[in-house]
Every structure is written in C-alpha cells, then in structure tokens.
Amino acid sequence: MAKQVFQTTFAGRELIVETGQVAKQANGSVVVRYGESTVLTAAVMSKKMATGDFFPLQVNYEEKMYAAGKFPGGFMKREGRPSTDATLTARLIDRPIRPMFAEGFRNEVQVINTVLSYDENASAPMAAMFGSSLALSISDIPFDGPIAGVQVGYVDGQIIINPSQEQAEQSLLELTVAGTKHAINMVESGAKELSEEIMLEALLKGHEAVKELIAFQEEIVAAVGKEKAEVELLHVDAELQAEIIAAYNSDLQKAVQVEEKLAREAATQVVKDQVTAVYEEKYADHEEFDRIMRDVAEILEQMEHAEVRRLITEDKVRPDGRKVDEIRPLDAVVDFLPRVHGSGLFTRGQTQALSVLTLAPMGETQIIDGLDPEYKKRFMHHYNFPQYSVGETGRYGAPGRREIGHGALGERALAQVLPSLEEFPYAIRLVAEVLESNGSSSQASICAGTLALMAGGVPIKAPVAGIAMGLISDGNNYTVLTDIQGLEDHFGDMDFKVAGTRDGITALQMDIKIQGITAEILTEALAQAKKARFEILDVIEATIPEVRLELAPTAPKIDTIKIDVDKIKIVIGKGGETIDKIIAETGVKIDIDEEGNVSIYSSDQDAINRAKEIIAGLVREAKVDEVYRAKVVRIEKFGAFVNLFDKTDALVHISEMAWTRTNRVEDLVEIGDEVDVKVIKIDEKGRIDASMKALLPRPPKPEHDEKGEKSERPHRPRHHKDHKPKKEFTETPKDSE
C-alpha cells in the first residue's frame, strides 16, 4: 500500500493522518499528527479464537521520553513500566473501543499507541484515541467503529474543545467524552462543583465535536480501508440451550431472587452445579465433551443475565428487593483507627471502604517526571482491592490498571474541595482499603475519604459523596438504577459514577457495554444521582457535621514564614550547610519553595518556634529609623562598626557618637561594648549608617546673658585681602572614611 496523507483542521489545530508508510505488517496502522504531537498506532489480531470466557483486548499507550526531548530518569536511563498517566490513558482508550466488538468475538486484539513527539498544547491522548479507532477501522479486524474522543474545558462560562495547556489551567472542567456518531459511550471528568446542567451541556457539545472526527475517519476508511475478515464467534448449541432453559430456568429464577449476596451466589451455584453434573455424565464419552461443557457454562450465564434484566425491566424488581432509585443501607464512622492522622469507615449495603489520612511536609510530595514539564503532586489517593473483599482468593502484588483507575477517580473527586497550599501547606495522602465489595466500591472510597479528611482536620470546602448509576436497556425501553450492586453492574449496560458536593459535581466516570446512550438517559441518570448524593451527604454530615478545627495529636504541626527570594540561598547555605545545621539543632523538617515560602514541620511546637527564630534572624533586614542593641566589633579612626544582628553590620561615624566633639573613638566605645543605635541611612549598595547620638538628649542651646543678650562669639581673626594664609591639610574622620 502506497503512502497516503489525509488532512483537516480540528479545534484550531492541524490534524494529519498518514497511512501505508510505517508498521505495514500490522493489520492496521496509522500515524496521527495533531499540532506537533505525533502518535503511531498499530492494531493486530490473533489468527485463532483465544480460550476463556472474555474478549482479550489489550490497549497500550507508550510514552517515549525522546518525544519531549528528555532523558528517562533512573539508573537505567530507559523507559520502564508505564507511568500512572500512561496507564490511565490506555484505560481511557480501551473503554470506548471495547463495546464496538461483536458479542462472542474472542480473538486476541492488541492496540499499541506510541507517542513519537509531544506537543503539550495538542493532546497526544486524544490523538492516540483517534488513531486507535482509525487503525482498527481501516484494518481487516471486525471492529464496528469508528469512535472518537475529545477533551472539553469550561473557561469564563464558555465550553472549549481540546483546550490548550493555558486554557486547561484556568478551566473549571476537565472532561473527556468519547462515542460513536450516534451516541456517547465513555465519560471521564473532574470538575469544580459544576451543575448537572453545565455538565450535560459539555457532554453534548463534546459529542458534536466527536461527530466531526468520526466523519473524517469515515472519509479515510472509504479510501484505504480493508475488507473485514470473517472470524469465528463464540456461540452455543441452540438445541442444548433450549433443553437447559426448559428444564432449569425456573430453578435459576428463584435463586436469582434471593436478596442477600452470599446466599444468592450460593443458591445460583447449587443450580449451576446440578446442571453441570447432569451434562458431564450425559456427555462423558462424547468427542466434543469440552465444547459441550463450555456451552453449558455459557448458557447458564446467559440465563442468569436474562433473568436479572427481565426482573428489572418487566417486574421493576431488583435482585435485592430495592426500588430502582433506592440506596442500600448506609453507615458512616470516623476515628476507626488510633494513631493515624484521620480515618473514616463507610458502608453501603455489602460494600465497605476504610480510608486513612496521612499528612506530611511538602518535601514528601510526589515528583512527576513525564512528557510534560516536571511538577510536584501534593495530593494522592490510592485504592486497594484485596480479594478477600469478595470472599475469594487471588493475586496479590502491585496495583493493577483497575486499582490505579479507581484511585484516580477518587483523587479527582476529592481534589476539587481541598484547601490551597497557602491555607494548608501539607502533602496529603489518602489510602482506601476496600474491606467488602458488592459493587460501587470506588464511590464508597470517596465517601470514606471525605470522612477521613474531615476527621483529620483538613479544611475541605465541602463534603463529597459518590454514587454509581446503572442502566438496563432492551433497545426500546430502559431503566436507570441508583446505587448498583455487583450483579447489576455485571449484567447491566452502564456503570455511571457521579461524585460531588451539595453545590455541584466534582467527578464523573461512565462505561457502557452497549454502543452508546442518549441525552435523555444522561439527564435522567444525573438527576437520580443528585438525589442519591444528597441522601449520602445527610449521613456523612450527621456523623461529622463540620471539619475538626485541630489536627490529630500525631500529625505534624506546621508554621510558615515568607522570605525574599534572594534570601533563600542564605537560609540554605553553601551545599545546604546552614539549613542542615538548623534541622540538626532543632529536629524539625524544613521545606522552601521557589517563591520563598518556608514551611517548618515538627510534632514539637517549641522546636518549630526555635527554628523559626533562627531563620527569621538569618533573613532579617535592617530598616531606617529602627533601633537595635548592637555590639561593637571593629574600631577605626573615623568611627566604629557595630553588629546589629547575625551578619548585618553598620557604621557609627565618629560624628554620630555624641553631641559633643570627640577626637578619639576609643574615648567613647571599645570592642565588645553593647550600645543602642538607630539606623539613619541605607544606601543603594545596602551599606548601613547608624547613630548613637540620635538616641541621646540634644544639649541645650547656648545660654543668654543677664541683659537677655546672646553671649558674644569669639572673633575669628581677619586677614588682609592681599594676605593668603598658608593652607593646612588636616584629615578629618569623614575624609578618611
């Protein structure tokens, strides 16, 4: 295939697509250039169906540091495991693509996005999402796309598509919306307490922009797209399916309607084990035994899936007996743990999360060194999901993509209400431990995080709560569910998480299993979520009505002082000598930022006060008219040098020592004497003049004689106008200065 180039303009930047030049052995590949960001996307498919009961799709987003002209960090100087941002971007691309493959498709598919050059003002993640859809669409892989995604901002009341970095910093909204040309199928957002109306408007305008990108993709597919390959889809034997449904559907229906999770799982497992045993015996010697038993398992799964959906759409009954807009029982607890800086335990039905707060000096902030310029991350929210939370055994180790994603969602939701660095100069870490799970654990972690922050004395603007909404749709009719549990998440069509305060939304996340949802469904889901959010906030506020005014006794205390930027080097000292000495003497921790904000941390307030005094002394500046108790450190003919404080000296000229004439400095002061002086002048070079006599009473004027006349002055000798006396040069103290 010869190289072809396609070009358009999108959101004020040039969008160029190149095909047929690189990675030609992949099923489909494209180079996407957006602004000066360049992403290579390659899509490949295995030749045969993979084993397993799920679609093995893998999406990678690779950040190459050379793309930003940077060296990788670390000893190896080579890219290693994906960064958190790269992992989140890969998930962001995976989620709108996954629903676009046929039910029963089991061939392994890999989509690899490599960032080759990076322009911080032209979104590489959005270029990668565009490239992923296009590479699949022009390939022979049976992908029912295209899809596209855009970033949406909200600045000065205006919705902006793919905002620049400067606009993003000013934006009240950080939204990614993706979908087909017909509907939205993925949402990820953080927001500064925006209303449901603004969020809906942003979603719909984002989708209009998505349609533009899809039209461009369709143009390219028409020009270079391959014919789709015919692949085997996983299907079950129709006769076997009819036989099992007729014999066992009523038993499974009864089991599904058991309200308590563990009891329901046990009841359905009894039915499944019974059916499995019957068919294992019946087909024990059959040459296709493995296929038949795979079909039996799949049929039972489909029966359970169908019954859950039927109950909700037809009978309006949920597996646990709740109404469609009803929340499970709620419970909130603070101070669950001693010694820690704050803790909250939140329970919603059989979902439970423990959140633990840790406060630390700003030196503990996380340094993020990726494709963007290096920056420090002050707030971290980490989410852990141990297998015991669902009563199972399983893998233990580093957090997976799901845990990273759920942690990031909670981080976005809570970050919007945190105090500024000036108000609360701490690094903040929340860790959510999921102790039980029956759906919506990420939202439970947000609620528990709010409890921990408030109990720990972090002055958040308002409490935040989260709720997960679900959807059951049969094409013509739909039902929106509030507070979905595990079974409804597994067999439902949507998982729409909404977090926020009473004033507005702080985070959204939506994943669906169908190809899109309408504005009508979004509107209804947001309205139901708002009602549920307020109910949860009622419980949180009843548990802890206000943020505590004091930190935990175990939390580090802090004091801050502001110094001039040019004084930072004085406090740090050569090679850190001065600051290290202060830390060693007082036992505190000290952080200094580039703007001269000095933060002093310790559990001992006296140590903080001592360190503060030392630093204040180091950066203290003399001021005109201020009085100091100074020490004489050097004597010259023209005056004495005195130390005002620390390394700051001043000159007291001999003429400023007393109101009477003095010929010798030593007649008035000696080295080591302490004297009171007043600063009278500081020149442009910072040299300080001080006066002793300015603090002394001024002597009275010469007295009058008895007649009230002034005493006569001694007469100066007069010289004849032609007489020129010999000039004598005498060095005065001021001349010698």
UniProtKB/Swiss-Prot annotation:
UniProt-annotated stretches for the region Disordered: 691-737
Key words, A-Z: Cytoplasm, Magnesium, Metal-binding, Nucleotidyltransferase, RNA-binding, Transferase
Pfam families: KH_1, PNPase, RNase_PH, RNase_PH_C, S1
Subcellular location: Cytoplasm
Broad EC category: transferase
Superkingdom to which the source organism belongs: Bacteria
UniProt key word Metal-binding: yes
UniProt keyword Magnesium, yes or no: yes
Residue intervals of the KH domain: 556-615
NCBIfam families the record matches: polynuc_phos, PRK11824.1
Family: Belongs to the polyribonucleotide nucleotidyltransferase family.
Record's protein name: Polyribonucleotide nucleotidyltransferase
Gene: pnp
